[in-house]
């Protein structure tokens, strides 16, 4: 699961908020405000690492469609599970996602971002394009945000594509590999998630 952490770190640094409020509902401005808010918060030396992590969790829960991401990454196996098992999976996935999101936050506290454009693919999806600006220690990194806009008043992030690599697809492939190697035993996946959460 370590191969996913670097992608989650990139979304982490844009989901920190110094105040709890609703962001603009227009996709490009929605992402732009998240980015600007993150930079302001992460550069504040008076905010502890623990507090930053708490802010990430709050903002992620409000602005990332974690449930939809979790169901997608589980794949077709979800159709074979009862409601109680799905509930357990959703709870574990949320904890896994949030821990991954905060795992290496401080490594990216000085990064600068730019929103470059927005491409409305349909009535319900817009791709917002951005990049991490090249620095002396890091190359430029292109990041595309898949923003779900079925509810026009509440956009949600459903995927992140970093240098062409989809966060959702990467996670789905990893979970699929674990399940396929263990006769689709969901309990093995639960153990893997719990190991990461408790590590």
PLM regions with names:
Residues 140-142, 146-169:
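Short beta-strand edge/turn micro-motifs at domain boundaries
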Residues 2-10:
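Sec-dependent signal peptide recognition
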Residues 73, 93, 117-119, 132-134, ...:
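A mature extracytoplasmic/lumenal domain signature
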Residues 25-103:
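Early exported N-terminus immediately downstream of N-terminal targeting peptides
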């Amino acid at each position: 699961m370590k191969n996913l952490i670097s992608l989650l770190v990139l979304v982490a640094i844009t989901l920190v908020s110094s105040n709890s409020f609703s962001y603009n509902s227009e996709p490009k401005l929605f992402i732009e405000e998240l980015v600007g808010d993150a930079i302001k918060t992460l550069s504040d030396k008076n905010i502890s690492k623990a507090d930053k992590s708490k802010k990430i969790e709050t903002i992620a829960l409000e602005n990332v469609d974690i449930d939809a991401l979790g169901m997608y990454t589980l794949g077709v196996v979800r159709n074979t599970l009862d409601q109680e098992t799905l509930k357990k999976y959703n709870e574990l996935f949320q904890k896994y996602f949030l821990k991954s999101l905060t795992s290496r936050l401080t490594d990216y506290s000085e990064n600068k971002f730019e929103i470059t454009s927005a491409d409305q693919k349909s009535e319900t999806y817009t791709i917002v394009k951005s990049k991490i600006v090249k620095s002396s220690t890091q190359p430029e990194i292109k990041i595309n945000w898949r923003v779900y806009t079925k509810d026009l008043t509440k956009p949600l992030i459903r995927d992140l594509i970093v240098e062409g690599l989809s966060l959702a697809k990467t996670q789905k492939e990893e979970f699929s590999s674990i399940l396929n190697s263990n006769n689709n035993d969901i309990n093995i996946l639960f153990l893997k998630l719990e190991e990461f959460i408790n590590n």
